[in-house]
């Protein structure tokens, strides 16, 4: 049998990781190209009869992915939902492939630099977006994503990883990497604010709490700092100078149930619960919620509860898109009872990461795990 030089598929895999990482914030095509190189490297890896050892977390994820496909077949969406689930499952492949080709710290540092560069490019493109709008900063930032919410959530997650890296570079005096991480972190925060994504803001705050908690050895000092920041934050938000700040007003609007956006979100959540109850155990199927959401709004006279004509039209548009405005309610409606082990998967990963951080010495891996924990918490809180 033809023998493959291990160095060849390792280099192909590394190239795939680099392209994938650089493309995260800027190009879906780039992500797919990077994934293509990773798949090729993985096939060569198998050809070379290399053993694959999955971690407990990877086994859990793999089982869930298989069950997602099975549930999609038997869901109300049938073959259509199965096809959509199959198309979207490729997003999880890097979880299994990337660790195979991160062979040393040099590769990790290149990956992190490319991650930061991806944020730079995304931010610059976002500035060009505002230039087209004649610098109308009331508009929500869109860079390479098709929707500001997508932009907001990935920025919230990315900024938390960068924060952990910043602390690492300062603690270990890695001043060569400090400028790129610091600039990327600042730009990510600015862009995050400009997206006006309230859920992403909450996600960032939740992830920030976890990151700071894990990085501060003195937990009493952490509690004092949280209380102090909370008091100062409330004082700043309620001060006269910031009472008309559009970003603060947007954040405060989360609790306003009469706000049109919030009302639509609640109606979509109600419809998802209705879908779950009426389509047990398999759900309505992947990307198949729009028909049921529209039926729910019509049957329960939800359009009549909207005050303005444009609000009724907007509700119909959102319902028709099948966007249920929450990973939890979307999973509940589309995947049925599988939603519970699916969400449990993320909580299990968090638990394993937390245990790792408690027992681990504070090296680069520790800070990377803390950063990815922050990312996962931001994802789960932002929902």
What are these regions (language model features)?
Residues 1-83, 101-113, 165-179, 220-225, ...:
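Transmembrane signal-anchor hairpin modules in multi-pass inner-membrane enzymes, especially those
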Residues 20-28, 326, 330-335, 366-383:
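Membrane helix-loop boundary segments at the extracytoplasmic
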Residues 28-48, 85-96, 150-159, 202-209, ...:
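Membrane-embedded alpha-helical segments of multi-pass membrane proteins
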Residues 58-66, 78-101, 110-114, 119, ...:
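Aromatic-anchored transmembrane helix interface
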Residues 194, 215-262, 270-278, 286, ...:
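A membrane-periplasm/extracellular boundary helix in multi-pass inner-membrane enzymes
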Residues 334-357:
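Selective detector of the "anchor" transmembrane alpha-helix that sits immediately C-terminal
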Residues 257-270, 282-335:
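Long extracytoplasmic/lumenal interhelical loops at the membrane interface
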Residues 16-20, 107-137, 146-217, 226-242, ...:
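Alpha-helical transmembrane segments of multi-pass inner-membrane proteins
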């Amino acid at each position: 049998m033809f023998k493959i030089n291990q160095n060849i598929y390792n280099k192909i895999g590394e190239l795939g990781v680099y392209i994938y990482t650089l493309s995260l914030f800027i190009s879906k095509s780039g992500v797919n190209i990077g994934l293509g190189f990773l798949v090729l490297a993985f096939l060569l890896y198998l050809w070379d009869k290399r053993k694959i050892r999955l971690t407990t977390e990877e086994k859990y994820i793999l089982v869930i992915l298989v069950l997602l496909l099975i549930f999609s077949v038997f869901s109300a969406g049938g073959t259509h939902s199965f096809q959509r689930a199959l198309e979207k499952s490729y997003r999880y492949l890097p979880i299994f492939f990337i660790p195979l080709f991160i062979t040393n710290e040099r590769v990790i540092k290149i990956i992190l630099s490319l991650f930061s560069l991806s944020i730079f490019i995304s931010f610059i493109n976002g500035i060009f977006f505002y230039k087209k709008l004649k610098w109308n900063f009331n508009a929500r930032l869109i860079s390479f994503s098709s929707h500001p919410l997508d932009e907001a959530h990935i920025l919230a997650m990315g900024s938390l990883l960068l924060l952990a890296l910043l602390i690492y570079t300062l603690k270990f005096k890695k001043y060569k990497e400090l400028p790129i991480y610091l600039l990327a972190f600042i730009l990510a925060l600015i862009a995050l604010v400009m997206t006006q994504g309230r859920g992403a803001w909450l996600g960032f705050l939740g992830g920030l709490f976890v990151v700071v908690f894990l990085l501060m050895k003195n937990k009493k000092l952490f509690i004092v700092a949280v209380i102090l920041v909370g008091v100062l934050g409330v004082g700043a938000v309620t001060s006269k100078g910031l009472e008309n700040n559009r970003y603060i007003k947007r954040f405060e609007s989360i609790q306003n149930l009469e706000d049109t956006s919030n009302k639509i979100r609640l109606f979509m959540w109600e419809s998802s619960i209705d879908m779950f109850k009426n389509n047990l155990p398999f759900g309505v199927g992947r990307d198949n919620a729009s028909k049921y959401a529209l039926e729910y709004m019509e049957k329960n006279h939800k359009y009549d509860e909207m005050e303005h004509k444009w609000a009724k039209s907007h509700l119909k548009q959102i319902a028709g898109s099948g966007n249920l405005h929450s990973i939890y309610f979307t999973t509940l409606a589309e995947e049925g009872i599988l939603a519970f082990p699916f969400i449990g998967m993320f909580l299990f990963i968090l638990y394993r990461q937390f245990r790792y951080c408690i027992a681990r010495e504070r090296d680069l891996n520790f800070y990377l795990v803390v950063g990815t924990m922050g990312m996962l918490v931001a994802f789960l809180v932002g929902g």
